[in-house]
């Protein structure tokens, strides 16, 4: 696991006016994206890995021995456009087959933190689902959590604490009241390790589970849920429930807010940030093209949005690929990217002391 030798020279606000992106090639632009001090709020730790990392563990466990490396990646991962959230979930469940012991989880967490630092992330809120990770091979969720926390701690120490990492707990398998409550209880039990609670996977209306979310909040954790992502849902009820009943502070994805002027005004009134994941939305067929992605409409309407990578292991992408897409297809500027990262820092679930320190250092 390679530790970067040189520190990233992050851009300051005053540096931006001297940078002309139009005169740069792709490689030069990526150097700029890396130097933006990024706050990433929506990334699934349990689905953050490189193709090389994934193949290492597939071969170690002798899975798919008759497939070439390319065939393995195509079989498990989700790198092509035009599929669906349902197909993505099916593939993600198949990926969980590699979660066979706690060593891989510690290794994965360590790798993920180091890679995020290399990408120029200064504050990283990872999220993971204990029930998802344990689903294939019955790993103990307490030991899963211990492995992830240990891997994160080891990586941040290796990096001399140059990246701050926080954790969000997800409830996402089963969707029964018992399953969601179990995840909520787990988050509360480990509230000193988690900063927030989420619901992911298949998008559902969570109104019948409001008591779990209110209980989690009452124990000091912040709330965000996946909502307004799935373009196939017949209405926007998941968003209204998230805002009006769960009283979330952020929404995972939330791009369908753009379909309703009422919702646009509602998220602005409630100071809710949308954790937007552009490449994910395209690959899961929730937007027709990057040129028509609603993040531009939302940003221009004054909705707080941030840029995120979602499941970079499944897509074999990173956070800077998302910046490149937004620049090429929607003409986002460096000033606008800095604004979004300021919003992300403001709406992060970490404590105010950490926010103040990071703001002084980078913003």
From Swiss-Prot:
It holds the Pfam family A_deaminase. InterPro entries: A/AMP_deam_AS, A_deaminase_dom, Ado/ade_deaminase, Metal_Hydrolase. Belongs to the metallo-dependent hydrolases superfamily. Adenosine and AMP deaminases family. This is Adenosine deaminase. Inhibited by coformycin and methylthiocoformycin (MT-coformycin). Catalyzes the hydrolytic deamination of adenosine to produce inosine. Unlike mammalian adenosine deaminases, also catalyzes the deamination of 5'-methylthioadenosine (MTA), a by-product of polyamine biosynthesis, to produce 5'-methylthioinosine (MTI). Plays an essential role in the purine salvage pathway which allows the parasite to use host cell purines for the synthesis of nucleic acids. GO terms for biological process: adenosine catabolic process; hypoxanthine salvage; inosine biosynthetic process; negative regulation of adenosine receptor signaling pathway; purine ribonucleoside monophosphate biosynthetic process; purine ribonucleoside salvage. The record marks 172 as: Important for substrate specificity for S-methyl-5'-thioadenosine. Pathway: Purine metabolism; purine nucleoside salvage. Zn(2+) binds at residues 42, 44, 226, 310. A purine D-ribonucleoside binds at residues 44-46, 172, 201, 229, 253, 310. The gene is ADA.
């Amino acid at each position: 696991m390679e530790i970067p030798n040189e520190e990233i020279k992050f851009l300051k606000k005053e540096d931006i006016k001297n940078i002309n992106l139009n005169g740069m090639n792709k490689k030069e632009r990526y150097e700029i994206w890396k130097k933006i001090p990024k706050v990433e709020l929506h990334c699934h730790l349990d689905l953050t890995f490189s193709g090389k990392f994934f193949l290492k563990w597939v071969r170690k466990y002798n899975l798919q021995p008759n497939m070439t490396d390319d065939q393995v990646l195509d079989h498990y991962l989700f790198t092509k456009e035009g599929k669906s959230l349902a197909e993505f979930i099916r593939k993600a469940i198949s990926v969980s087959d590699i979660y066979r012991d706690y060593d891989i989880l510690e290794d994965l967490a360590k790798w993920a933190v180091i890679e995020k630092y290399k990408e120029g992330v200064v504050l990283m809120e990872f999220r993971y689902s204990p029930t998802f990770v344990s689903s294939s091979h019955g790993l103990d969720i307490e030991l899963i959590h211990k492995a992830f926390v240990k891997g994160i701690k080891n990586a941040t120490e290796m990096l001399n604490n140059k990246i701050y990492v926080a954790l969000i707990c997800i409830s996402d398998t089963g969707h029964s009241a018992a399953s969601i409550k179990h995840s909520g209880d787990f988050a509360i039990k480990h509230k000193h390790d988690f900063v927030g609670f989420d619901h992911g996977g298949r998008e559902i209306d969570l109104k019948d589970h409001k008591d779990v979310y209110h209980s989690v909040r009452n124990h000091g954790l912040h709330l965000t849920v996946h909502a307004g992502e799935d373009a196939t849902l017949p209405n926007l009820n998941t968003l209204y429930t998230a805002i009006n009943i769960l009283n979330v502070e952020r929404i995972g994805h939330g791009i369908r807010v753009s379909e309703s002027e009422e919702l646009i005004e509602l998220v602005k009134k409630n100071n809710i940030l949308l954790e937007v994941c552009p490449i994910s939305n395209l690959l899961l067929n929730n937007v027709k093209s990057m040129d028509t992605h609603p993040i531009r409409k939302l940003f221009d309407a004054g909705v707080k949005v941030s840029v995120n990578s979602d499941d970079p292991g499944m897509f074999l992408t990173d956070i800077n690929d998302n910046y490149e897409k937004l620049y090429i297809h929607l003409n986002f500027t460096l000033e606008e990217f800095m604004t979004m990262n300021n919003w992300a820092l403001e709406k992060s679930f970490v404590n105010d002391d950490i926010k103040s320190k990071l703001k002084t250092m980078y913003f």
